[in-house]
Structures are given as C-alpha cells and as structure tokens.
C-alpha cells in the first residue's frame, strides 16, 4: 500500500533517506541491510559519514522533486497510522547528522568531509532540540538529503541522540509549523542498540509532547534542592535617602523591608501581612518606644520603622514569622549569594557602602527623618561618624569586611554596623568586597548616645568660635553713619536665648548671612529683621537718630535684632529710655525713608525655633 507520508508531503527538510526494499523482505531485514550498505560505504571512503550526498541503498532527492515522489512510491506500509520505514531513517530534527552525537548526549569527535550541504557539517543541528526547528533553518531552505552513517541505526529518531523513552514510547516537541498536531507519525526503528526494546521502539512525533534535553555541555545547570514554593524571596534595594541597603521579603503580596545598617523593620508593612485593620495597626505602632516615621520616599519604605526585636515579637504573636522567612534570620545576606545573582548583589552592596562612606566624609551628619520627632528613643543620625575599633567579622566565602561596629548596646544582640572609610587597597575590587559583618553576629539595635554627646559638644564649640569671630570682625571695621542710623539703642533687651547657627552671620549653613546677601556690608548687618514679642509693637524713630554709636553690637543686641541689624522696631517700653520728639520723627521720615526702603527685606529665622517670622517693611509707618 503506497500512500503519502503525513509529514506534509516533502516540506520537511529532505532528510528522509528511505531505501526501497524488495518486496517480500521484512522491515527488520531491510533496515539491517541498509545499515550494512551504509557502513560499507563509509568505511570504504566513498561517502563521508556526515556528508549530505547519496549512498547505495538510499534513495535521495530534492525537496520538492524526488523527495515528494518518494513519499508516494516508497514502501510506506501505512496501517493504523504506523509508517514502517524500511531504510535507515535519519533524525529529521537532527538534520540527518546523527553521526556526530554519542549515545549519551555529548558531542563526539565530528567526522569532517566533503559536504555539499549549503551550511556545511552539522551547522545548525545543535539548535534543533532547543528550538524545535528541523535542521535549525527555515522551512523553505532546501537542504540535500543525507546519508546515514554507521551509527545511525542505533537511534534514528533521537533528538540529538537524547530520546527519553517512557516505557516504549518517547516523545519530543516538534514545534515546526509544518508538522501539525494532526500528524502522529509512528516510525519503527529497527536494530536499536541503546533503547530498551531494540526490536521496535516507538517514537511519537507529537507537537504536544515536550522534551528537556540535558545535552548541554557549556551552560551551567543548577538543580535547586527546594521546590519553587519554598524558594527564598529575598531581594535588595538601595535606600538613597538614608544611604543604606534594605533587604526585602515578599509575603502575601506585601513587601516587608529590613534595613542593613540598624536592622530596623517596617512595622506598617509587617502588620499588613497579617491582615490587621488600620486602626489596630496604628494603635500598636503608636505605642512603640523605638520607632521612626518615614513619610516620603518609595511606597514600600514608607511607614513606621520599629526595632528588630519588637518586629520579631509582633510577627510571632500574629503567626506570620514563618511566612516572612528569612526576614528575621541574623545572616540574611547569606541568602543573597546564589551563583546566579552574585555579581548584581555584589555591585549593589558595594554601591551602598560607597555612598555611606561618602556621607561619612562629608562634614557633619544630618539627622534622619523622624529623628526630631516625639519618640523617646535617641535620634538616629544619618551617618555615624565615630566608628570604634570593634570586632569586624568576615563572611565565610572569604569576602573582606569593610565595616566596623560601634557602641555596646547589648540586648541579646550586637550593635549596629556602620561602614568605615575603605582604604584604596581594599576598594580595588569593590564589586566583590562587601560588608558582611552581619554573618556571625546577631541582630542590631541603634545606639547613638556617645556620638550624640560628642556632636553636641562640637556644635557648642563652633558656636562660641563663631561668636568670637563675629565680634572681632565687627570691631575691626568701624560703623558708618548709615549703619549707626539703622542701629538700635542699647536700651531694654528682652530676649536672652543663646545664639544658634540660624542667626550666625557669615556661617556657611545660614542662607541669610552676610556671605549670601550682596546688599549687606561690614559684618553683615541685615536690614529687615525685627524683634518678635507678644506685646504691642510700634515704631520708635528716635532710636535711629539718637541711638548709641558703639563700635560693635553685643551678643544681646544680635539676639534682639536677629542678625545684628534692626530697622527700628521696638517695644512701647523702650520709649522711656530714649528721647522722642516730633522733629526727630519728621526728620526720620524724610531722611530715613529712601535708605530703609532700598534695604533688603529678608525673612529671618527666629532664635528659639526654626520657623520663619515676620519681615520688617522699613516704611516707617506707625503700627498700632
């Protein structure tokens, strides 16, 4: 019975080499005979083992010519959709070059010879199993049919020699669109040496089947011990505002973050995991003694951050500690160092440490958000600038530690690690050297008592030095007549708050100082500041004409005026200390108006708080 093959009538690859066997000969004998003929042809040197030419015992043809006819005239006994191929049938997926593959899936030494194939010896056959294309090329590229080699009878229909047969049937994905799901062609291979049933091992060419070929020799294959459901979900993010790294664990659709520097955990997201209501959650977090409120930044970083011990206690009480594993592990960094994502993790941690080192090299530390809040805990500074010679531990993989430990606030866990300034020798490969001091230590809680005291002392010393420099500077330059007019009298001084950096003239952090105002001259007497009081305020113009002509303003004078200058704003009680006359008032309005109107009207910060107070208009109008 001669019928057409279901394999799309010759649109395959032309790699079928079906030898017409004489009638009356069984399929097994025909296959053995064809294999013997091919073997003798290869050994005699007439035909190379992997060439694409014709050999005795194999009917070859072009793609649309003889191959198409061959499917009609060849001896295909099509009974119960089984096609018995009597010749040596090379693998259509492997492109016919099945001789270069050993029985165990690893490529053997290829036999190079004269190949009339347009792509040379075994050009695209290595991609056949991975992508499902026959011969790895387009379906209209005519590749000449090939000759079976001496070893091709062992596995005719193997995908790169890696047929994984389940029982007798082996399936592999044939995703070329010329072989539809309607062509379940069963080809009987004969004299198979490596299959269990060498007499007739069935191989299904179904497009629905799928085969994972383990025949890769270069690409690494990691066999994870844990199933997909049990794999760790630890990710990292760089919190640029805080200059630290955060470890994140996703549980029930909520991302819970843990800081790297002090191990504090986002309590808001933590309680969201257990499905707690907003009122109950906020009530619990409001009563926390040690907390930091973050209101700006990324969504998964906003919320109330609480200490590690308290977060672990809340997680255990609500039964979500297991769901958040490994968030509460002391050495959570060890879960990041998988060979797949090791370079990226190394780069992120190195960037975090470089940023933290830059913050330490910057003069003075700025407090983190929430440090000046109403919490009872000591404020957490953004960068701890006083690293001590604590114990530094290295990770088990030999990565050098760049961190140092500060403080000794021990509540069953170690103190907070802060990175020191790395030396050039230790930062030459910053992508691989990381801060691994959490590996052999417990969790950390922030302690900043010593550093806070030292910073307060430094600020006081700086304030005293600035006061002395200001007085010396103002004594060195005598006051002009205009400054004497704008200067108040040394009369009743109401305020006695200590001077701070906000009103230090010429300080780098003072945006209203003399260094930043071009209109100010000789010591930075800023025109426009006024005295703030809850009493009734009025203008006293006599002070501007009859004020004292001292060479330099005193400290109380600067406290009253805000920056050593005044526009004549006084209290009503000050009228007793200086004469007042209508002539002086008229003279003031005629002479002082242009000078005061041209002065800079700048909002000055108050002495007690950082809120901006009012601005003097300098118009001389009487305010009641």
Swiss-Prot record:
Residue ranges constituting the HTH APSES-type domain according to the UniProt record: 233-339
Positions of the UniProt region annotated as Disordered: 1-24, 43-99, 352-456, 474-504, 538-624
Segments of skewed composition (Gly residues): 615-624
A biological-process GO annotation: conidium formation
Annotated InterPro entries: EFG1/Phd1/StuA, HTH_APSES_sf, KilA/APSES_HTH, Tscrpt_reg_HTH_APSES-type
Bias type Basic and acidic residues, positions: 571-587
GO cellular component, one term: nucleus
Comp. bias intervals (Low complexity): 43-62, 352-362, 392-426
Annotated region of DNA binding: 267-288
Location within or outside the cell: Nucleus
Principal place of residence: nucleus
Post-translational modification: Phosphorylated but is not a target of cAMP signaling.
The keyword DNA repair is assigned to this record: no
Described purpose of this protein according to its UniProt entry: Transcription factor that regulates asexual reproduction. Binds the StuA-response elements (StRE) with the consensus sequence 5'-(A/T)CGCG(T/A)N(A/C)-3' at the promoters of target genes. Regulates dimorphism, virulence, and the sporulation program. Required for mating, gall induction, and sporogenesis in maize tissue. Regulates expression of the filament-down-regulated gene UM00205 and the teliospore-specific gene ssp1.
Name the record gives this protein: Cell pattern formation-associated protein ust1
Organism: Mycosarcoma maydis
Lineage: Eukaryota, Fungi, Dikarya, Basidiomycota, Ustilaginomycotina
Underlying gene: ust1
